[in-house]
Regions:
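Hydrophobic membrane-embedded segments
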Residues: 1-27, 31-117, 124, 128-133, ...
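General small-molecule cofactor/ligand-binding pocket signal
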Residues: 152-156
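Active-site scaffold of zinc-dependent metalloenzymes
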Residues: 161-182
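Active-site recognition of the HExxH zinc-binding catalytic motif
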Residues: 187-201, 208, 236-237
Length: 282
C-alpha cells in the first residue's frame, strides 16, 4: 500500500470521526472519539491492508483493466502496420534516480520531526531545573493514586500551570507559585494529571505526532492532531468528575478557569492543565 493510499484512507476515517464528533460530542463518552482517532492513526502509520469487499479499491477496476477484467483486443485493419504504443512518461527524478516528490516528502518529514524533537528537548532541558515537591500532603495524594509506574512530583518556576510528561517514568510538574498542597484545588489538579498518566496520553500524543510528521501534506491529519489532543482533555475531565463526584463538578470547573497554561513553555508531548477550548469542557 502506497503512502498516498494510506493518507487517503486515513483522511476518510478522520472525516467520518470528525462528523460523528460534531453530532454527538456531548452525548457519547469521550473515549469513543479517541478510539476513532486511534483507528485513523493506525491506518495512517501501518502499511497493511485487510482485504474487504467494502474497500474503495475493491470496487474500482484494477489499473490497466477494462470493466470486463481484461484488455480489449486491438483492431488491426488488413494491410495496415501495427502502431507501437506510446512510451509512458517517466516520473521526474533527480540525478541520483530518486523521484523529486519523494525528496520533497522526506524533507517535510525531517523538518516537522526536527521541530517536534527540538521543542521536546528544549522543554526537557528546562524541566531539569525543577526541584522535588516534598510536601507530605502531596506525597499522600500521589500514593493514593494507585499507579504501578513510579511517578515523580516536582516544582518548577518555568511554568504557569501543572503538566505531565514522560511515558515509562512520568513526571507531574507543578508551578513553584502554586500553593495549597492540602486544599481541594490541589486534589483536582493531581487527579487530573494522574488521569493523563493512567490513560497513557503521552504515548498517544507521540503516535499523533508521528502521524502528523509522516503525513504533513494532508491537512486532515493536522485536524485530527488538534481534535484528538482536545478530546484527551475532555476524556480526562470526564474521568476526574466521575472519580471525585459529579456534585463537585462546579469546583472542578472553577479550577479549570483559574489555570491558564503558559504556551511558550509547553511542548507537543506534554499534557497541561489548561483552559484551552473551555467551551467544550465541563
Amino acid at each position: 500500500m502506497s503512502l498516498l493510499q494510506m493518507s487517503f484512507q486515513g483522511g476518510a476515517l478522520i472525516l467520518a470521526a470528525a462528523l460523528l464528533r460534531a453530532l454527538t460530542l456531548h452525548r457519547l463518552p469521550k473515549g469513543t472519539f479517541l478510539a476513532l482517532w486511534a483507528v485513523a492513526a493506525a491506518r495512517l502509520l501501518v502499511p497493511v491492508s485487510i482485504p474487504s469487499p467494502w474497500s474503495v479499491y475493491a470496487l474500482a477496476p484494477a489499473a490497466g483493466e477494462s470493466p470486463a477484467g481484461r484488455l480489449p483486443a486491438e483492431t488491426v485493419l488488413p494491410g495496415a502496420a501495427p502502431v507501437p504504443p506510446a512510451p509512458a512518461a517517466p516520473p521526474a527524478e533527480t540525478g541520483g534516480g530518486i523521484p523529486v516528490w519523494t525528496l520533497v516528502w522526506l524533507a517535510g518529514v525531517l523538518a516537522w520531526g526536527g521541530f517536534f524533537l527540538v521543542s521536546y528537548l528544549r522543554c526537557c532541558r528546562e524541566f531539569r531545573t525543577a526541584l522535588p515537591a516534598d510536601e507530605a500532603p502531596l506525597r499522600e495524594r500521589l500514593a493514593a493514586g494507585g499507579l504501578r509506574r513510579p511517578v515523580a512530583l516536582r516544582r518548577s518556576d518555568r511554568i504557569a500551570a501543572p503538566l505531565t510528561y514522560g511515558i515509562l517514568r512520568p513526571v507531574i510538574l507543578l508551578p513553584k507559585t502554586l500553593d495549597g498542597a492540602g486544599g481541594a484545588r490541589m486534589t483536582w489538579i493531581l487527579e487530573h494529571e494522574l488521569t493523563h498518566i493512567r490513560h497513557f496520553d503521552a504515548l498517544f500524543k507521540l503516535v499523533l505526532t508521528a502521524a502528523a510528521c509522516v503525513h504533513w501534506f494532508n491537512p486532515l491529519v493536522w485536524g485530527m492532531y488538534l481534535l484528538a489532543n482536545r478530546d484527551m482533555e475532555l476524556r480526562c475531565d470526564e474521568a476526574v468528575v466521575r472519580r471525585l463526584g459529579v456534585d463537585r463538578r462546579g469546583d472542578y470547573a472553577r479550577t479549570l478557569i483559574s489555570m491558564e497554561a503558559c504556551k511558550s513553555g509547553l511542548g507537543p508531548l506534554t499534557s497541561a492543565f489548561s483552559r484551552n477550548a473551555a467551551e467544550e469542557r465541563i
